[in-house]
From Swiss-Prot:
Function: Phosphorolytic 3'-5' exoribonuclease that plays an important role in tRNA 3'-end maturation. Removes nucleotide residues following the 3'-CCA terminus of tRNAs; can also add nucleotides to the ends of RNA molecules by using nucleoside diphosphates as substrates, but this may not be physiologically important. Probably plays a role in initiation of 16S rRNA degradation (leading to ribosome degradation) during starvation.
InterPro entries: ExoRNase_PH_dom1, ExoRNase_PH_dom2, ExoRNase_PH_dom2_sf, PNPase/RNase_PH_dom_sf, Ribosomal_Su5_D2-typ_SF, RNase_PH, RNase_PH_bac-type, RNase_PH_CS
Record's protein name: Ribonuclease PH
GO molecular function: 3'-5'-RNA exonuclease activity; tRNA binding; tRNA nucleotidyltransferase activity
Annotated EC: 2.7.7.56
Catalytic activity: tRNA(n+1) + phosphate = tRNA(n) + a ribonucleoside 5'-diphosphate
Native source organism of the sequence: Pseudomonas putida (strain ATCC 47054 / DSM 6125 / CFBP 8728 / NCIMB 11950 / KT2440)
Domain of life: Bacteria
GO BP terms, alphabetized: rRNA catabolic process; rRNA processing; tRNA processing
Positions annotated to bind phosphate: 87, 125-127
Self-association state and partner proteins as the record states: Homohexameric ring arranged as a trimer of dimers.
Amino acid sequence: MKRPSGRVADQLRSIRITRNYTKHAEGSVLVEFGDTKVICTVSVENGVPRFLKGQGQGWLTAEYGMLPRSTGERNQREASRGKQGGRTLEIQRLIGRSLRAALDMSKLGDITLYVDCDVIQADGGTRTASITGAMVALCDALAVIKKRGGLKGGNPLKHMIAAVSVGMYQGEAVLDLDYLEDSAAETDLNVVMTSAGGFIEVQGTAEGAPFQPEDFNAMLALAQKGMNEIFELQQAALAD
């Protein structure tokens, strides 16, 4: 089996995490997984949604979008169509769920964190890149809140989280699929994990033929290997 990119089965794409990419948001990152590029920002606002008022905890919510020409052909802006598509809603809910799992909301205070992930160039794995980059932006936003005198209840961060795609391509488990592989893969999994080794979410779909338990185990093992490398890259970015 030869991957279109020339990578071996357990090899990630080149990953870059650039912090403080924009000047206004409390946390901002440009994350690059190969040719996939996503700008992730975290904005801090006082107050919480109505359903959380008086409960003594904060909130985090996420939005996701793609520039019209982030793909090979221009896509119409969802705003011009008057509503978000099902894929967009699914992805932004995944991003929000994943990042909330990293936080103890009771220590956040009366604050809402708005996470925005905007894909400027897509080559597969946009949702996993978004989660990975937004986690670093979230860390920077928490540091800003603390500097402003917040987080008096302690650090709300329970652990880091990251995400990566794995799949079955030409009968073999492969790590971090690009668009060409994703389009031809027999199975595609998106895996979200904590730095402590726990799973937050596993999304999997077979195309054409079911995948077997041994395939699933092989893909999870690859995801765990890749995730360990990604956590190291996140920590290196935060240390700069």
